[in-house]
Curated annotation (Swiss-Prot):
Residues 98-107, 562-575 have a biased composition (Polar residues). Pfam families: PH. It is found in: Cytoplasm; Cell projection, Podosome; Cell projection, Invadopodium; Cytoplasm, Cytoskeleton, Stress fiber. The gene is afap1l1. Gene3D superfamilies: Pleckstrin-homology domain (PH domain)/Phosphotyrosine-binding domain (PTB). It comes from Danio rerio (Zebrafish). This is Actin filament-associated protein 1-like 1. One of its GO terms (cellular component) is podosome. SMART domains: PH (SM00233).
Amino acid sequence: MEINSKPMELLVTELNMLLKLLDHETLSCATEEKKMAVKNLLRQLQPSVTAKDYMYVNTSVYRNGTSFVESLFETFDCDLGDLKVEMEDQKKEPEANHTVTKPSKTDSPPPLPNTPPPEDYYEEAVPLSPGKMPEYITSRSSSSPPNSIEDGYYEDAENNYPTTQVNGRRKNSYNDSDALSSSYESYDEEEEEKGQRLTHQWPSEENSMAPVRDCHICAFLLRKKRFGQWAKQLTVIRENRLQCYKSSKDQSPYTDIPLSLCSVIYVPKDGRRKKHELRFTLPGGEALVLAVQSKEQAEKWLHVVRDVTGQGNGLDSPSSPMIPKKIELDKWCSAEKQTSDSDSMPSGESARDIRENGKPKRGALSELTGTVSRAAGRKITRIISFSKRKPPLPGDSRSSFDHDPRCGYVGVLVNRCWREHWCRVRAGSLYLYQEKGEQRVPHTTVGLKGCEVVPGLGPKHPFALRILKGGAEVAALEASCSEDMGRWLGVLLAETGSSADPESLHYDYVDVETIANIRTAARHSFLWATSTGSRTYDEVPFETEQENERLRGRAQTKRRSSFSSSDTGKPSPQITLKRHGSNANQYGRYGKTRAQEDARRYLKEKEDLETEIDSIRTALVALRKKKREAKEKMKSATDKQKLALEECVTKLEDSCRVKEGDRVDLELKLTQVKENLKKSLAGGEMEVPTESKPAHKTQRTEAQYMESFLPVNCASEMRKRPPSIYASTKGNVMQKAKEWESKKGT
């Protein structure tokens, strides 16, 4: 019985379409066996369908389930002769001018492309069923040349394809028609939604690759290398292991990861990441990052991983944990990162290096580990810029600012961006410099008189301070920690002259412990700034002043040594106390006002202590006298009187012991006051005016006390001192000093 070729051809086409539809359905075992039997019969019938040597039927499942050939013929209502061939084929075959008959819907499908696949030709294998050939999803990125050949996998593809003939001349199985090949999905953000993917049935000759045999899913995916580069590799999931091959010709994988021991995370593409990523992480190991083309493809791989590891079967404790809500968490972290990056934008060269075209540069390490906090970034910036710091100049008044609470690095809000500057508070003004130790004029100066300091600037900046003047914000500062915030708060409150107490301010967005740290630091810095001499330090170089003072002291000593003894006995109208460099370096650089006030205060304390000590000594003399009298009476008293006298003596002894303890405490305190007085006199030049009236005993006594502590450089001056000074300095200490000098002289 002769079979018509056209009905038979139509039957084969429809059966192939039916088989393709059944491939995507869930079938029973019996139906699956029947389907495989029909498919095997079709393979045997296909070579004898037409008079040609071999007819390859190219079928595909479109998104709506219809045949690729049928949908193509319904869409394109034109002659196949209108499809142009490449110019190279026309040169090789000049006899291509021939007539082409108009095809019908029952004609054979169009030929396969005959151009080599592009460089980044992309394939993805559909999970295999028993006896079913693998299917591949092909795509190409626009960035690669159209005629490049993939290494390894595609070198022999042209030889494996049979030749076909469709209504005319014989051709190779490849064609240059891009309409028949699938469009691509670009990795670029703006081309994510381009194109649609088509599934092609490849001939059985292509199934001979060893890596893809018996695999659940396979594809050429991009793998991230150590330093951020991407390399294309054949990735296969076989049994419960993830394997990567550098080439499809390799027999053994160079990366083999057990899926039952690793966690899988899907990271979607966003403004920072240019690719959809799958991260396979082993406990205590590095992450294997693979790039997929779309979210759908990532979900397909995740579904296969779940099936392989047992999560798809509803196990209670999956061996390969999947982190829930990872996408939402990454989006939230990304938004927080972008906000913090814009808030903590660095300045200078670092800003130009970090930000380019409005997007931050990120390396491979930062992409794997995420972002760092603003404080850590600020510390890293300081470490990097440590070697760039300028050495102190010879004329610099202070070689180090680290111990001055009024100086330090602080974040400043400039044009809605936070920049780090070196700040210094001095003379009621806030000076902002680009770097520490700059000698130039500060680029910003803020007057602090009459301003108000308010802590806090929202939940993202809990350690910020706002400086308000007349209700308007003139500056916004941000410290790196609670201690720095308290230090700056206390200094600014003192400089602004505000009556607000650091503990009475309202602190938002910080816990109780942090508030306690802020208040403690603010109280200390406030007390330091409001002390007697916090704002009277010399801000000028002091070494030259020391040399000048030494020269003046030597000249004045020579002049004084030539005076007569009668001149030295007279009180001078004013007493000038010189400043000595050795003591000044030891006790700090004091200003003139600070030295005068400290000297007066210590002199007054010294007088009060000496008066109190004298009263205690007088009381002790009286108590000891009573005790001696009581003991004398005990010798001639009766027994009853002795008991009463013994109790009286005991009480007197206790009183003497208490008084003696008080005297010792006051003596120690007096010694400390005298030491402080020496420091204050050595720290600055003091002029104590005395009135010309000889009856004013207080100022005369004050002058005598101060003169007693003058440094003596000449033995003749020591002998010229009046007896009153010797009387005031008598004691065990002076006696021992004199004995030591006499021993040293002999």
